Design a protein with these regions (language model features):
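Active-site glycine- and acidic-residue-rich loops that bind
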Residues: 62-69, 103
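Conserved beta-strand segments of the P-loop GTPase G domain that flank and frequently precede/overlap
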Residues: 33-34, 57-61, 87-89
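Single conserved hydrophobic/aromatic residue that forms the stacking wall/gate
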Residues: 1-8, 12
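C-terminal lobe/tail of nucleotide-utilizing enzymes
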Residues: 74-173
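Switch II (G3) loop of P-loop NTPases
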Residues: 5-6, 18-44
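Glycine-rich phosphate-binding loops of nucleotide-dependent enzymes
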Residues: 36, 49, 162-165
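Inter-motif core of Ras-like GTPase G domains
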Residues: 22-28, 44-64
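Short glycine-/polar-rich loops that comprise or flank the Walker A/P-loop
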Residues: 8, 51-56, 80-85
Length: 173
């Protein structure tokens, strides 16, 4: 029977989350971002229980299939007392010779924003559209945050400014 082992896995995931949140010294963070896989929302529910003031940022890509899943993930806010702060669209475009190429289509983030706003009864804004940048992957694989230069300063190029704008929106009350 598959159900008992799935349930046990959920228990271990929740315990791991609780240990992660309690054993790591966070200082006084302004924002703590947890990257949760889309799906049933079990982890989002666990986060809401462990962090009562948690808010949700839904991340999608432009494709309709991805935005449909993102809407379902955002609707977990109806099950728990969690506000959806906004939507981020990842891999929105690839810039080549000054032209923005929409490799994966367009509009997924806006669709998610509109559908969640309608379903939840409040504005769920599209907070950022992040470009597809091979350099971000390379920097991540090297173990460095993609928003920082080699010297540790915040990047001042397009991706740095995009992330700065997103951070400012997340910190705004």
């Amino acid at each position: 029977d598959v159900a008992p082992s799935r349930g046990l896995g959920d228990v271990y995931k929740r315990q791991s989350l609780e240990q992660f949140l309690s054993d790591v010294w966070w200082g006084e963070p302004d924002v703590l971002l947890l990257d949760l896989a889309p799906g049933t929302g079990d982890m989002a529910i666990s986060v809401a229980q462990a962090l009562p003031n948690a808010e949700l940022v839904v991340v999608t890509t432009p494709q309709p299939s991805a935005s449909d899943i993102a809407v379902r993930s955002g609707l977990v806010a109806l099950q728990v007392p969690m506000k959806v702060r906004g939507v981020v669209e990842n891999m929105s475009y690839y810039e080549h010779k000054g032209e923005k190429l929409e490799i994966f289509g367009a509009g997924g983030g806006q669709r998610v924003s509109e559908q969640l706003s309608a379903a939840l009864g409040y504005d769920v804004p599209l907070m950022a559209q992040l470009p597809l940048e091979p350099e971000v992957r390379e920097i991540g694989e090297a173990g460095r945050p993609a928003v920082l230069d080699v010297d540790g300063a915040l990047r001042t190029d397009g991706i740095g400014q995009t992330f700065r704008g997103l951070a400012e929106r997340l910190l705004a009350v």
